[in-house]
Amino acid sequence: LSPDGLSRVFFFFFCSAAVEVALKMSFHSHANQGKPATTRFIALRNSYHGETLGALSMADIPLYRQVYSPLLLEPLFAPSPDYFGKYEHETDAQCALRCAAELEAIMAKHHHEVSALILEPLVQCAGGMRMYHPVYLEQARRLCTHYGIHLIADEIAVGFGRTGSFFACEQAAISPDFLCLSKGLTGGFLPMSAVLTTEPVFESFLSSERSRGFLHSHSYTG
């Protein structure tokens, strides 16, 4: 059922934990491959990814972020391609392509220090149910591949059919490097989340050196 290439799964127990896992795993995977300088992330304006510190760092909603801002990571924020930002006489697709061009400018300048781009595919839910054209996802995937940046798709709120396809990414016919899932995963009966990732990411952690392993757990949890 998952998008092509996502053959490995890391399970956890609540929504923003999946985002924390994806952020850490992306950075650690790059570091294991000799790229320890990729300490930054790109997120979209008006985004929301949860309220633990890493996830909150990727958010752009002052209500949640402002009071904790001294504690947070500082991502590079790219313009949101949502329809609210359309220029007069601009189509939905043209708006998405214009914002993708601005995303490319950020990547061209900062790709050497960026680990991943994180986004909510098609709908920014907590940001006001703001929607955007699937062509933006196509361009985001192309740019991430070109610049060697991971693509994290946070489908915690939009996965499992909520946008019309089983996963929102399917509407752009793309596969991210990390797919964050929760909510619909258990139909609300059990708090659980999952991060799906690729075989190359998984293999980047295979080593007899413990420091290269993904040591992410809690000593007592549900």
Question: What is the predicted function of each stretch?
Answer:
Residues 1-222:
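Conserved N-terminal phosphate-binding loop of PLP-dependent enzymes in the Aspartate aminotransferase
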